[in-house]
């Protein structure tokens, strides 16, 4: 540990540039699914333990489409649509029945959904780790001490575009306004003529679509595996806990913060502690 600290701040401080960049790339992906969780939690009071599994599912859908030689922008669009429909279906089958139930009911239901998705993905894709091999090259700086894969740059750009689209949608669209009104006071929203059941269904489907988009980016720059969903669920809960519900700027800031925290933890204590770092926030 002491040697790693010396490496960071005395012998090779330029490594901090690599860690900060990696933290930014990580945070951009985390922010998408974390905001979806914040919406579902804030609007419906559902703590979705299957959140990370939605991300992994989106990654596997992207991997399948990539093997069909479909261009990446089209893959992203298709995955978002499929996950939106999937999320709406899960709402009708499961979530709709537990909205007004005790918190532990929602935790048990979504935990069961998480286990089901893990086993289905394992059945279809196997337990091996997989990734989308973009073969895009990268940028080397500071005599090779800092490496930036072009796939990570692309993922950051795509995450920024999606985030801007979400901000515009939530502020300008009627459904976005209905979601915010329902989050503030569901009864008042119903009095004003808002179909809260439709808002709930759309919110959960929208969350699944954001997870799907995050999954595409995860498959591009890391690896996916059927049982990795729990790690993303923990990260999302840590981000939402730090940022608060329905606060997109806060979610983005917390996502970048946790991304940096993870990378520095991995560098100082070892990669075995990297994924465990967000747990300290909960």
PLM features: what roles do these ranges have?
Residues 21, 43-89, 93:
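Membrane-embedded helix boundary and interhelical linker motif in transport proteins
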Residues 1-32, 61, 72-75, 101-106, ...:
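Membrane-interfacial amphipathic/re-entrant helices at transmembrane-helix boundaries
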Residues 26, 145-225, 248-253:
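Helix-loop-helix "hairpin" substructures at the membrane interface of multi-pass membrane proteins
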Residues 37-59, 100-105, 175-178, 196, ...:
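Short, non-helical or kinked segments that cap or interrupt transmembrane helices
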């Amino acid at each position: 540990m002491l040697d790693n600290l010396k490496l960071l701040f005395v012998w090779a401080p330029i490594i901090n540039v690599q860690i900060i960049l990696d933290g930014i790339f990580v945070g951009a992906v985390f922010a998408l699914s974390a905001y979806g969780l914040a919406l579902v939690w804030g609007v419906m009071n559902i703590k979705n333990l299957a959140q990370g599994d939605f991300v992994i599912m989106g990654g596997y859908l992207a991997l399948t489409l990539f093997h069909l030689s479909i261009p990446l922008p089209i893959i992203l669009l298709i995955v978002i649509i499929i996950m939106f429909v999937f999320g709406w279906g899960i709402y009708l089958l499961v979530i709709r029945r537990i909205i007004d139930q005790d918190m532990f009911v929602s935790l048990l239901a979504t935990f069961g959904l998480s286990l089901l998705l893990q086993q289905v993905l394992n059945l279809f894709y196997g337990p091996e780790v997989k990734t989308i091999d973009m073969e895009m090259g990268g940028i080397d700086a500071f005599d090779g001490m800092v490496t930036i894969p072009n796939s990570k740059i692309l993922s950051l750009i795509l995450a920024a575009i999606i985030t801007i689209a979400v901000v515009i949608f939530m502020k300008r669209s009627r459904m976005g306004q209905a979601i915010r009104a329902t989050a503030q006071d569901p009864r008042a929203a119903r009095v004003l003529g808002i179909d809260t059941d439709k808002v709930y269904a759309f919110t959960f489907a929208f969350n699944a679509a954001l997870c799907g988009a995050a999954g595409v980016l995860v498959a591009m720059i890391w690896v996916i595996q059927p049982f990795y969903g729990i790690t993303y669920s923990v990260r999302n809960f840590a981000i939402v806990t730090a940022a608060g519900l329905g606060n997109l700027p806060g979610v983005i800031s917390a996502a970048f913060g946790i991304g940096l925290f993870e990378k520095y933890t991995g560098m100082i204590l070892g990669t075995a502690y990297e994924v465990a770092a967000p747990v300290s926030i909960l």
